[in-house]
Amino acid sequence: MDVSKALLWLEKQQTESAVKKAAKVADRTANEGLIGTTVLSSGVANGRRVGVRAAMVELNCETDFVARNELFANLLEDITHTAAFISEPANAETFMQPFSMETLQNAPLLSQTKPSQNGKATVSEAMRDLTGRVGEKISLRRALTVVRDPFTSSQPDLALRVAARVHQSVFNPTQGRIGSLALLALKSKRLSEVIASQTFQDDLDKLCQALGRQVIGFPTTCIRSPSGTTDEGALYDQPFSMFIGPGNDQSVGAFLQSWAQERSLVNEDEEQSAGVEVLEFAKWSVGEVV
């Protein structure tokens, strides 16, 4: 018996079966699923200014049962990693950019946990194969990436930091029914000195985690409200209830100012723009209309 030929025959049969099942369920509605996040490079890390490379993807199926399947979670993890890995830095005013569904579906699937499998199937082929195994429609709803190279040596006072957060996770702590990405900017004449401190790194991690919880836990729709108004959907107007520790009775905007001053990001001779600021955020819920 020729084992290699037998394996090729079996693979062909599995592919043909998956193609038939995918065609059969193509017209079904898929509004369940998970939102996945991945951060390949967070920006300020380990006392250095590095680039930012992250992604958020929503993968859908028909039932919550399949959404809780480990195979589904593994595929979402690989697709999210692929989006973050192949995305190019954006030449636009905004850092967070929608990622083309066509480009992503036609891209080779790149696994972070199983690199030996890289390039053996495209994203769309991997989705089709999962349909063949679970019998449900699997579809991509949306994806976004944030990719920015490190600031040059001519901009030593600027750095970025990306924070990812999910809620209602199952298998993977980077996946849930609600997901968010937030991008922070740090600006200071003393930036290199300040970020070299391990204490500062720990404090920044804590701040990012709290901001992620805040964006998800509150009905957050924007960063600032229009001048002269207060909006419960504006992040900076909300009480910073999701920060664990002193100061969480302040608004998020006031807290960020105090936080930057206490950690010497802002000095008396600094311009007003020095400190820490939320530049952009994205917040998704599974199945919502886009």
From Swiss-Prot:
PROSITE patterns the UniProt entry points to: EF_TS_2 (PS01127)
Keywords: Elongation factor, Mitochondrion, Protein biosynthesis
Regions crossing the membrane: none
Keyword Transmembrane helix appears in the UniProt entry: no
Subcellular location: Mitochondrion
A GO term from the CC aspect: mitochondrion
GO molecular function annotation: translation elongation factor activity
Pfam families reported for this sequence: EF_TS (PF00889)
Domain of life of the organism encoding this protein: Eukaryota
InterPro entries assigned to the protein according to its UniProt record, in alphabetical order: EF-Ts_dimer_sf, Transl_elong_EFTs/EF1B, Transl_elong_EFTs/EF1B_dimer, Transl_elong_Ts_CS
One GO BP annotation of this record: mitochondrial translational elongation
Assigned protein family: Belongs to the EF-Ts family.
Role, per record: Associates with the EF-Tu.GDP complex and induces the exchange of GDP to GTP. It remains bound to the aminoacyl-tRNA.EF-Tu.GTP complex up to the GTP hydrolysis stage on the ribosome.
Miscellaneous note of the record: This protein may be expected to contain an N-terminal transit peptide but none has been predicted.
Protein name, UniProt field: Elongation factor Ts, mitochondrial 1
